[in-house]
């Protein structure tokens, strides 16, 4: 299945892309996707610890192992900063 990942703010800066599509096997969940994202962009590992994640525009925690399906969209949103 294909999952679209959207990167915002610091995660976009570190990954070097705005969005990316990952191929996962049937039965995959958010924790599997997170592992693939870190494998593709190891520098994101430290950034991910402070991010929130949205699965199809609903906030989720990757460790909750939400089931994914083909065509899902996951947004990686770092905390807001600045003034």
Curated annotation (Swiss-Prot):
Q: Which residues carry this modification: 1-thioglycine?
A: 83
Gene3D superfamilies per UniProt? 3.10.20.30
Give UniProt keywords alphabetically.
Answer: Cytoplasm, Molybdenum cofactor biosynthesis, Nucleotide-binding, Phosphoprotein
Annotated pathway: Cofactor biosynthesis; molybdopterin biosynthesis
PTM summary from the entry reads: C-terminal thiocarboxylation occurs in 2 steps, it is first acyl-adenylated (-COAMP) via the hesA/moeB/thiF part of MOCS3, then thiocarboxylated (-COSH) via the rhodanese domain of MOCS3.
Q: List-wise, which residues carry Glycyl adenylate?
A: 83
PANTHER family from the xrefs? MOLYBDOPTERIN SYNTHASE SULFUR CARRIER SUBUNIT
Q: What is this protein called?
A: Molybdopterin synthase sulfur carrier subunit
Q: Organism source for this protein?
A: Chlamydomonas reinhardtii (Chlamydomonas smithii)
């Amino acid at each position: 299945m294909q999952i679209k990942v959207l990167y915002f703010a610091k995660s976009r800066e570190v990954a070097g892309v705005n969005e990316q599509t990952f191929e996962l096997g049937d039965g995959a969940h958010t924790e599997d996707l997170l592992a693939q994202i870190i494998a593709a962009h190891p520098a994101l590992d430290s950034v991910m610890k402070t991010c929130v994640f949205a699965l199809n525009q609903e906030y989720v925690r990757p460790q909750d192992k939400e089931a994914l399906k083909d065509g899902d969209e996951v947004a990686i949103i770092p905390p807001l900063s600045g003034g």
